[in-house]
A protein has these predicted regions:
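Conserved SAM-binding loop of SAM-dependent methyltransferases across substrates and taxa
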Residues: 53-66
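Class I SAM-dependent transferase core
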Residues: 1-47, 77, 84-90
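Conserved beta-strand signature within the Rossmann-like core of class I S-adenosyl-L-methionine
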Residues: 140-150
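SAM/dcSAM-binding transferase cores
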Residues: 155-204
Length: 204
């Protein structure tokens, strides 16, 4: 059962258009499945890439208060909402809200190569998500991506993933389904490219 405070926050996010229509309880269940897929170790450092209305980030914050968590989003209205939600849910200082373009933040020392894991519910297509996330991950970090229900082996080509610095890919069948990518090495200094270049010329 979800806390009334968390449900109230997510209902507010839905009213504001930060999350889509649908059952809030279903959204919470899906966010919890992110945690099950990731199995974060105690006291590790994670980020929610493109946190939006706080899925899965706010659920992770409530369910796993030991985890240091950064909620990253480029929209000032969404990060303003997330800041209020973090205060209301009393999950600070373990949870920080970061406003900015992920492709720019990933080149800053504060964020580059420092996270044990990255959650991605709906950040972007696989190529964009993989290219942005690898720069945030420490070696042996994991990227957890929400997947569509039907398998498509073309979504995550291993050759291109290895060129970015990933070592392994596992599909968690669920349901719900997730892709788990493990980082091996730090990417080249130009990774990630700007969002314009990533979307116009995806790596795969």
């Amino acid at each position: 059962m979800s806390s009334p405070q968390l449900l109230a926050v997510l209902e507010r996010a839905q009213t504001l258009g930060h999350i889509g229509s649908g059952s809030i309880q279903d959204f919470v269940g899906h966010a919890r499945a992110h945690i099950s897929a990731a199995r974060p170790a105690l006291d590790t450092h994670w980020c929610d890439l493109g946190s939006g209305g706080g899925l899965p980030g706010l659920v992770v914050a409530v369910e796993r208060p030991d985890v240091d968590l950064s909620l990253i989003d480029r929209s000032s209205s969404r990060t303003a909402f997330l800041g209020e939600a973090v205060t209301y849910l009393e999950v600070a200082p373990k949870v920080k809200v970061v406003n900015g373009d992920a492709t720019e933040l990933a080149h800053k020392n504060t964020f580059r190569g420092v996270f044990d894991g990255v959650f991605s519910r709906s950040f972007g297509p696989p190529a964009a998500t993989a290219e942005c996330a690898i720069a945030f991950l420490a070696n042996d970090g994991q990227l957890i991506v929400s997947e569509p229900p039907n398998e498509d082996p073309r979504r995550w080509p291993m050759k291109e993933l290895k060129s970015l610095g990933y070592a392994d890919l596992e599909i968690v069948d669920g349901p719900p389904r997730f892709a788990r990518l493990i980082s091996a090495i730090q990417p080249d200094s130009e990774v990630p490219r700007s969002w314009k270049h990533i979307t116009k010329r995806p790596l795969f």
